[in-house]
């Protein structure tokens, strides 16, 4: 037998017998294809035998050979397809088509072109069969007329073939190594290698085209021998299906017994829906009893040989009973509603046909049922819809509802648009209402802030800006008031407490920059010199400042704490409104002991008594220059800041600046009556002749003008 499989002559004989008769021998063709698929012959030898048979001059033999080749292509396996798609076979077909001597028969030519086209269409996407497509496109370009194309799936060329044999040094089941005594054997079903003990069974493999018993291993034998029981159960289930209502002859998968229950359920639902659609009335539908369904439910039961089928049927029957109960309840409720509506007055009865295009519950249920059936039919065999006339009737009844459904859909869309417009209007109204509430709330906050802010003096602020002098004239009137006994400005100073200004300046963002006067002092001093000549006597101080040639003069000098004109303006702004206001709570602050540098010696005795003695401990360096100024009342004021800037050490000046910054950043700034008289009150006296409303407090420093000039001449 091995020689019969190895030689090609028996195959040639079979091919001759298959192609010799005028009629096609389908059985012999399938036998040859099974022989090729089972690898009983080499695929290349089979291809060459067919090629030699095609060279026969008889057109009938050529047609029979082409049909045999097509059968082998569809059932011979992948290994034979590779040989058919080789250049050796395809070029032979092309040479037959282009034969110049004796022309090819038209029938043979048409069949050959049709087969080439079908093979090329089925082999699309497979690289190992790409030459089929190339040959097909080449013939198209050369002008050969192919028949019309037909939809061919790639599964046409798929066929089961024996697997390729796998080599190994040990048994792939018991892991025993092979030796001279322990020979290796291949399983024809899986292709693995086993020893004699693990592969002693033999079985025919018809699914691979092997009809003779061949060697298989124990695992494949167990799998293949267990199939007949499954096949028997499948046969029983197929008989059960044949006895059912469907009478379907189409082969179904293994899970068909579960799908059969769904088919019966769908069939019952179809019958119920059709009867309801036929028997429906204006007052709704009334479900009628269906005694004919009982035989349909009881017929499959005798044929159920398994418990699973019985359980499935019981579940289906329970679901059907529940469905019937729900439908009866719904019908009773619908009857009650319709009877109640009919017993009402005529206007109420006339309002019922208000919406004639509204779908009834029966129509809605039929539409949903039809959609469900269509979805399930997609997974059924193609001929199922033709065997179910009830589906066609349901389709026709639903098709008549299409205009009604379109009108109902249009009305629903119009209602939707109306509701959207109303929603937009409501959103606009709510937005306007929120805006109105926000405006009211903001106005309430503004009124609340007006009651607590420095509003009464706000009108006086614009009048103060043009009269701001330089920083050098800031403290000199205070010094003159002390030296020359002009106490007219000092009494209101404790009541005003101008040092409450730094917190306000800090709110406006001025304190941080006012603590560093040397950056703006050179520019602000000359800018206010002309005004200072006309108002008071600050020019000598400016000259003294210029003569010092120190970019950072002694901060301990009273005239240099607020040197920049840009920072004096806010001081003036907040100073005058507080002249008329009672500032008594700002006086007793203990912060005055920290930064009043010139209180102990440079001021009258009354303010000194009000302050604690801690001030003298903190500013001893400042008390001495103040004493010198009190003793030298006839000296010019221009020499005072220069003297402090020269004689005070740089460390003391830095300490004084730090103390000034701390006092300006503190929350109090309230207890500086004496320090403020040294800085702000006299400074306001220099400027007040032009802009300040209270003239009494600021016109007094004008008296010592000649004295200052005389003292400058004496210096």
From Swiss-Prot:
GO BP: protein targeting to vacuole; protein transport to vacuole involved in ubiquitin-dependent protein catabolic process via the multivesicular body sorting pathway
Domain annotation UIM: ranges: 261-280, 307-326
Chief place where the protein resides: membrane
InterPro entries membership: ENTH_VHS, HGS/VPS27, UIM_dom, VHS_dom, Vps27_GAT-like, Znf_FYVE, Znf_FYVE-rel, Znf_FYVE_PHD
Ranges of biased composition (kind: Low complexity): 291-302, 650-662, 697-706
Zinc finger (FYVE-type): 165-225
UniProt xrefs under SUPFAM superfamilies: ENTH/VHS domain, FYVE/PHD zinc finger
GO cellular component: endosome membrane; ESCRT-0 complex
One Gene Ontology molecular-function label: ubiquitin binding
Biased composition (Polar residues): 510-551, 589-609, 627-647, 663-680
Keywords from the named record: Endosome, Membrane, Metal-binding, Repeat, Zinc, Zinc-finger
Record's subcellular location: Endosome membrane
Superkingdom per UniProt: Eukaryota
Record domain VHS: where: 16-147
Topological type in the membrane: Peripheral membrane protein
Complex formation: Component of the ESCRT-0 complex composed of HSE1 and VPS27.
Domain comment in the entry: The FYVE domain is involved in the binding to phosphatidylinositol 3-phosphate (PtdIns(3)P) which is required for the association to endosomal membranes.
Record family assignment: Belongs to the VPS27 family.
Protein name as it appears in the record: Vacuolar protein sorting-associated protein 27
Lineage summary: Eukaryota, Fungi, Dikarya, Ascomycota, Pezizomycotina
């Amino acid at each position: 037998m091995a020689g019969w499989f190895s030689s090609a002559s028996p195959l040639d004989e079979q091919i001759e017998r298959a192609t010799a008769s005028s009629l096609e021998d389908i059985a012999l063709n399938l036998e040859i294809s099974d022989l090729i698929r089972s690898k009983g012959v080499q695929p290349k030898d089979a291809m060459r035998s067919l090629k030699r048979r095609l060279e026969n001059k008889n057109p009938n033999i050529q047609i029979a050979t082409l049909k045999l080749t097509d059968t082998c292509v569809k059932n011979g396996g992948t290994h034979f397809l590779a040989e058919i798609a080789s250049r050796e076979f395809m070029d032979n077909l092309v040479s037959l088509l282009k034969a110049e001597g004796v022309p090819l028969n038209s029938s043979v030519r048409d069949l050959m072109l049709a087969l080439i086209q079908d093979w090329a269409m089925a082999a699309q996407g497979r690289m190992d069969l790409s030459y089929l497509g190339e040959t097909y496109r080449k013939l198209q370009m050369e002008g050969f007329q192919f028949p019309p194309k037909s939809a061919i799936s790639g599964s046409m060329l798929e066929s089961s073939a024996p697997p390729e044999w796998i080599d190994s040094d040990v048994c792939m089941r018991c892991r025993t190594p092979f030796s001279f005594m322990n020979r290796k054997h291949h399983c024809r079903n899986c292709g693995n290698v086993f020893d004699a003990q693990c592969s002693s069974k033999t079985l025919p493999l018809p699914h691979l085209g092997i009809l003779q018993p061949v060697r298989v291993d124990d695992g494949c034998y167990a799998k293949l021998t267990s199939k007949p029981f499954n096949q028997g159960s499948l046969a029983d289930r197929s008989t059960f299906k044949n006895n059912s209502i469907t009478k379907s002859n189409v082969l179904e998968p293994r899970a068909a017994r579960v799908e059969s229950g769904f088919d019966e359920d769908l069939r019952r639902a179809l019958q119920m829906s059709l009867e309801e659609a036929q028997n429906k009335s204006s007052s709704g539908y009334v479900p009628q009893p269906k005694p004919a369904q009982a035989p349909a439910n009881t017929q499959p039961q005798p044929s159920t040989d398994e418990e699973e089928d019985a359980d499935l049927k019981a579940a289906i029957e329970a679901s059907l009973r529940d469905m019937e109960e729900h439908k009866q309840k719904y019908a009773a409720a619908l009857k009650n509603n319709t009877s109640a509506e009919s017993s009402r007055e005529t206007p109420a009865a006339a309002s019922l046909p208000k919406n004639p295009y509204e779908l009834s519950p029966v129509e809605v249920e039929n539409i949903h049922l039809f959609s469900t059936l269509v979805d399930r039919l997609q997974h059924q065999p193609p001929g199922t819809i033709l065997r179910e006339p009830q589906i066609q009737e349901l389709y026709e009844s639903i098709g008549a509802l299409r205009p009604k459904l379109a009108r109902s859909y249009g009305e629903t869309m119009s209602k939707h648009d109306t509701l959207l417009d109303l929603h937009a209007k409501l959103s606009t109204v709510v937005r306007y209402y929120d805006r109105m509430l926000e405006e009211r709330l903001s106005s309430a906050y503004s009124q609340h802030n007006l009651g607590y802010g420095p509003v009464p003096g706000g009108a006086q602020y614009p009048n103060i800006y043009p009269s701001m002098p330089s920083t050098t004239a800031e403290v000199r009137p205070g010094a003159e008031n002390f030296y020359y006994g002009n106490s007219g400005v000092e009494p209101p100073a404790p009541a005003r407490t101008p040092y409450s200004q730094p917190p306000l300046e800090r709110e406006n963002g001025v304190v941080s920059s006012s603590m560093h006067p040397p950056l703006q002092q050179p520019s602000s001093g000359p800018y206010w010199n002309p005004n200072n000549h006309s108002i008071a006597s600050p020019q000598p101080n400016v000259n003294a400042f210029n003569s010092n040639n120190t970019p950072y003069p002694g901060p301990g000098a009273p005239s240099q704490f607020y040197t920049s004109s840009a920072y004096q303006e806010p001081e003036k702004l907040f100073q005058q409104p507080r002249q008329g206001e009672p500032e008594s709570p700002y006086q007793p602050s203990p912060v005055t002991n920290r930064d009043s540098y010139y209180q102990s010696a440079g001021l009258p005795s009354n303010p000194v008594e009000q302050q604690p003695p801690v001030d003298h401990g903190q500013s001893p360096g400042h008390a001495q220059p103040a004493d010198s100024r009190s003793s030298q009342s006839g000296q010019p004021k221009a020499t005072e800041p220069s003297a402090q800037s020269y004689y005070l050490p740089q460390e003391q000046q830095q300490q004084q600046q730090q103390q000034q910054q701390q006092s300006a950043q503190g929350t109090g700034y309230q207890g500086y009556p004496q320090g403020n008289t040294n800085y702000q009150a006299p400074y306001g006296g220099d400027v007040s002749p032009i802009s300040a409303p209270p003239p009494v407090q600021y016109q007094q420093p004008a008296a010592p003008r000649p004295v200052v000039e005389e003292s400058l001449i004496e210096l």
